[in-house]
Regions:
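Extended, highly charged
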Residues: 3-171
Length: 171
């Protein structure tokens, strides 16, 4: 059976989402053991979070993971699997998983306007500019290489939620 978290409407950022997962049994595994972003990080998640080589989507009850010690990237963490199951996403948004597609549609129709503030913002604690002389995205972001045969490191989120036009069934 799926883990159901308390109804959430106060999750407005990744930090809060991770904290909610930390407080929900079985939803987050965190490690300080060094992991190499080249094939090792995704391999560890494959067995701990996804439950081995499985049909997609990822195992519904598998935890998200936070790696706090990334080889070559001191003081950097990587979160993986936060949105790995529809049930987890639904729990974080406080809706039933069958309502996610409709929620996405509603959000696209009524986007939230940005808020401008003169106060310190947590998302601006560290700022890197492409115009900085030492700017190098590959040194800043520990983008994983998922397999030894990948063309290189990449950041991606493949997500699709569709409803069959004739049957009304959603995937």
């Amino acid at each position: 059976s799926a883990i159901v978290m308390d109804h959430r409407t106060d999750i407005l950022d990744l930090r809060t989402a991770l904290e909610v997962l930390r407080q929900t049994p079985g939803q987050l595994v965190e490690t300080d053991v060094e992991v190499d972003p080249e094939a090792e990080l995704s391999g560890v998640y494959r067995y701990v979070g996804a439950g081995g080589t499985v049909m997609r989507p990822t195992r519904v009850d598998g935890p998200a993971m936070v790696f706090n010690n990334i080889k070559g990237h001191p003081d950097t963490s990587v979160a993986i699997g936060v949105l790995a199951s529809r049930q987890r996403v639904a729990n974080l948004f406080g809706v039933k998983k069958e309502e996610l597609g409709h929620l996405l549609c509603e959000c696209a129709k009524a986007p939230v306007q940005p808020i401008v503030t003169d106060k310190p913002a947590p998302c601006q604690e560290v700022v890197h500019r492409a115009t900085d002389p030492d700017f190098d995205l590959f040194k800043l972001v520990p983008a994983p290489t998922n397999t030894p045969v990948d063309a290189g490191p990449y950041i991606t989120l493949g997500m699709c939620y569709a409803t069959h036009p004739d049957t009304g069934l959603s995937d």
